[in-house]
Amino acid sequence: YREGYHIKYDMCRFTYCMSRIHTHYKSTKAVKGRTKNTHDHILGSSLVGECVLDNSDIFLKDEKGFEKMFELYLHGLLVTFVTKEENDLLAQLRGKFLTKDKYNEVGIVLQDKEGNQVELPAPPKILTEWEIKKFGLKDTGYKPIEIEPKKLIQFV
């Protein structure tokens, strides 16, 4: 790497790395703790940014545009705790599977602090609609739990 590259890299990823809302959901493999674990942002920052730019007309002109953008932004801060291997597998699915289907595709089972099996909150509909249009993906029909933006505060 070039000299000083790590500083530029860290600065570009500051929001992504330093801003997170912990769901306190962990994959069953991460709970076992036999491998290296990491945080996974449920929505990648580049995915959120690209969706916002491609839908700027909605976010700028729609009466509730800011609310829709803020909901997307909040979801982009949600993190789970998974194994490094699971995180790497999830990263490879961008543009191949809808975000709402990725954990199922990799076979990641999540649990909360008490050990109860849980589901990820559904990403905002605008993201799923955008992924279908942008990447030509098919909807599997899987319907994750929908959470209003105000209720995302439960994770803070």
In which residue ranges do the predicted regions lie?
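A structural signal for short, well-ordered beta-strand segments and their strand-loop junctions
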Residues: 38, 80-84, 110-112
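Short Cys/His-centered divalent metal-binding micro-motifs
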Residues: 72-98
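Generic local-structure boundary detector
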Residues: 48-59, 84, 90-94, 114, ...
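Nuclease and nuclease-like effector domains acting on nucleic acids or nucleotide cofactors
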Residues: 1-35, 98-101, 105-115, 121-152
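Histidine-centered nuclease catalytic patch
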Residues: 32-74
